[in-house]
Amino acid sequence: MNSHTKQKIGVFGLGKTGISVYEELQGKCDVIVYDDLKANRDIFEELYTNNSIAALSDSRWQNLDKIVLSPGIPLTHKIAGIAKNFNIPIISDIDLLFEKSKNLNFIAVTGTNGKSTTTALISHILNSNGLDYPVAGNIGVPALQAKASKDGYILELSSFQLDLVKTFTAKIAVLLNITPDHLDRHQDMTGYIAAKSKIFDRMDKDSYAAINIDNYYCREIFMLLQQEQRIKLIPFSVTKILKNGISVVGDKINDNDISYKLPFNKNLQGTHNCENIAASYAVAKIIGVESKKILESISSFQSLPHRMQYIGSINNIGFYNDSKATNAISAVQSIKALDNIYWLAGGIPKEGGIEEIKPYFSKIKKAYFYGQAKEIFAKTAKNIVDFVICDNLEQAFDLAYKDAVGDNAEVKNILLAPSCSSYDQFKNFEERGELFMKLSKRHCEEITK
């Protein structure tokens, strides 16, 4: 990385991102590192025997050319104060990847919900059609660990990551939706929207932005960019057919004034996935993939784990894992896509609880609440939908399964859409989803014995 050769650089945060940054920079410049968590420092010392760890009291932090901050570190942290006091620029791993690959196309995807599925769907479409676009970023692959590419990268970017970027410039940017989230980090919606809007920074007339104009906050950003006239804009909608833009309404995808039949894919059910499809189609068309080829790729897409993941169906009971639905807005999307639902929800509740889901309670046959949120959710559901309070996810699943087996309805669905973060009982949403999948498969095996 020539632009950083012989510079003094600090890496703060030693999770996956921080480690990837250190591995990129070591031997090319003078690097010091730190993490507030002793466990992360210990892991680093096991991996690397050199003396790179320096506490923030070390004066070397005051004499750096740059500090690379991991996205989990808020800008209110002491390290940000040191950077400000000593005029040290804070950058991100996203900037580092961009600076060494400026000749390639960068596709950036953000939004409160749907980022990972859209990122994966774009990648599937492009790579199925002979192009080379690895994914990286918030999807679980640190930017600097993305495999080498000849065409470009598709980056899923969270508001935390966008807060840190300084030089990164997207060729194509996607804004899926904005709803209240991470307000503890951004203070209020104004701060959150400002962070999301940074995806369009430094883009010019040769760049493209695909924006969901059904969403109020996204529409406001779209209109502001229209006034600026510095980016080529492609609006998309799932509620109305646009004469100039991309629409997914019913079983049709409309590309300006041309309509195509949308292939059914059980892994892409629900309004939220219509948004993901519209955005992915727009990006693929910009890149130059033919409409017919895009539709073929959509039909063969396999959903990501824990994101409205269809696990299987037996005796008319379908099992759906939407563990990634960590807020009510996200859970609404999976609930809207199904009927006769045995709903598993709980964990650490987000602001507003499940109020957003109340209009869709008629789709829920019975709810099973667990974790810290169980009493709060029960209060919202009282006298509207039948529910049971459970100790944990496993108990909730067992009760839901028993009730579904006894239901004579033609179609029944057991849905994990927690509407909460997972940290009261699990390490993360992935561990929560893995347990649900294990339980689903175990019960399917019992039925078939």
UniProtKB/Swiss-Prot annotation:
Entry-linked Pfam families: Mur_ligase_C, Mur_ligase_M, MurD-like_N
Binding positions (ATP): G111, T112, N113, G114, K115, S116, T117
Catalysis: reaction(s): UDP-N-acetyl-alpha-D-muramoyl-L-alanine + D-glutamate + ATP = UDP-N-acetyl-alpha-D-muramoyl-L-alanyl-D-glutamate + ADP + phosphate + H(+)
Pathway(s) where this gene product acts: Cell wall biogenesis; peptidoglycan biosynthesis
Alphabetic keyword roster: ATP-binding, Cell cycle, Cell division, Cell shape, Cell wall biogenesis/degradation, Cytoplasm, Ligase, Nucleotide-binding, Peptidoglycan synthesis
Main subcellular localisation: cytoplasm
EC top class named in words: ligase
UniProt GO molecular function: ATP binding; tetrahydrofolylpolyglutamate synthase activity; UDP-N-acetylmuramoylalanine-D-glutamate ligase activity
One CC-aspect GO term: cytoplasm
Domain of life the protein comes from: Bacteria
Cellular localization per UniProt: Cytoplasm
One BP term from GO: cell wall organization
EC number(s) recorded for this UniProt protein: 6.3.2.9
Function: Cell wall formation. Catalyzes the addition of glutamate to the nucleotide precursor UDP-N-acetylmuramoyl-L-alanine (UMA).
Family assignment from sequence similarity: Belongs to the MurCDEF family.
Record's protein name: UDP-N-acetylmuramoylalanine--D-glutamate ligase
Organism: Rickettsia felis (strain ATCC VR-1525 / URRWXCal2) (Rickettsia azadi)
